[in-house]
Amino acid sequence: MGRAFEYRKAAKLKRWGHMAKTFTRLGKQIAIAVKAGGPEPENNPTLRSVIATCKRENMPKDNIERAIKNAMGKDQSDYKSMTYEGYGPHGIAVFVDTLTDNTTRTVADVRSVFNKFGGNLGTMGSLAFLFDHKCMFTFKIKDGMDMEELILDLIDYDVEDEYEQDDEEGTITIYGDPKSYAAIQKHLEECGFEDVGGDFTYIPNDLKEVTPEQRETLDKMIERLEEFDDVQTVYTNMKPEEGGNEE
């Protein structure tokens, strides 16, 4: 689906390449959802959405149930969503999305990586103009479904008319205004779509070319950032490698 599809296709496995870390990060999302809306998925739309994403990432049912149970414990940490942004090497914008129970630790970890690679960590919001903040929903394709009709129904929620279809997985991914997250999810569920997994993403509005050598350095920086458990996703405005095998 244009720039969003190009960017997400290249970044997908880099974000969720290590299964253990994937489950840790999803566990934090479960904790936040339970804290906000309770442990019952039928009464907590956000939790339903996170569980659908967990299933799509092959997170075992026992892990999901344990994460929900742990989230109700008195000793469960309170996670906070924080973003950190700045310029990495070669003038590439780097946007780091985190869930943390210790912002002092997290900002120190992130800053250390920026410094190591000759980057510069900026203030919150300093690079917001380089990325479009979107909500996204992935759901199973239904037999005989009319995507044009569905998109038309969702126009009032600022859903984009371009969408991403994965024939191998049998899923559709749509993008919309983050403020309309709950309304979009409700509409999709009322339409009978199954396993509606929702999330938020940042899509670069202009991709920058880099040389193979520059890409290697930037990939190392991204990998180093993603080693931290607090880091959920790292976004950049680096143009994906053509003909690469990231997915």
Curated annotation (Swiss-Prot):
GO cellular component: cytosol
Gene Ontology biological-process entries: regulation of DNA-templated transcription
A molecular function (GO) term: DNA binding
Protein keywords: Cytoplasm, DNA-binding, Transcription, Transcription regulation
Superkingdom to which the source organism belongs: Bacteria
Coiled coil: none
Location of the protein in the cell: Cytoplasm
SUPFAM superfamilies in the cross-refs: YebC-like
PANTHER family assigned to the protein according to its UniProt record, in alphabetical order: TRANSCRIPTIONAL REGULATORY PROTEIN YEBC-RELATED, TRANSLATIONAL ACTIVATOR OF CYTOCHROME C OXIDASE 1
Family of the protein in this entry: Belongs to the TACO1 family.
Protein name: Probable transcriptional regulatory protein BT_0627
UniProt source species: Bacteroides thetaiotaomicron (strain ATCC 29148 / DSM 2079 / JCM 5827 / CCUG 10774 / NCTC 10582 / VPI-5482 / E50)
